[in-house]
Amino acid sequence: MGNLMSLVLVALLFSLSLAVIADTSNDATHVKEEVKPSTEATDAIEAEVEVNDAVVEPQQGLPGGGCRFGCCGGYWWNGLCIYCCRSQAEANEVVKTVEPQKEEAKP
């Protein structure tokens, strides 16, 4: 009787695994139907990233890990700044050059 129960259990597990494999392979045939973002969405994201990147720059490496115009990014575990701010005049100049590109992206 114990052997019969083991055989039934193995058959049940085998049929369950076949059902899972069949379902998975059915899902794999529909992979070609991917959703791609519209160009409007990607243009808006790229413009936003350019504006954000224009304001900050990587750690400038001043002695002691300080930044000349303050810290615009988070602090690392040892207290050093991740991104240093630019001077206000330089940041305004860069933002003005990026803004026309952002307006062109709008339809």
Swiss-Prot record:
The name under which this protein is listed is Late embryogenesis abundant protein M10
* Native species: Arabidopsis thaliana
The protein's gene is named: M10
Its job: May be involved in the acquisition of desiccation tolerance during late phase of embryogenesis.
Signal peptide range in chain numbering: 1-19
Per the record, the GO terms for biological process are: seed dormancy process
Q: Which domain of life is it from?
A: Eukaryota
Which keywords annotate this record?
A: Signal
For this record, the Gene Ontology CC terms, alphabetical, are: endoplasmic reticulum; extracellular region; vacuole
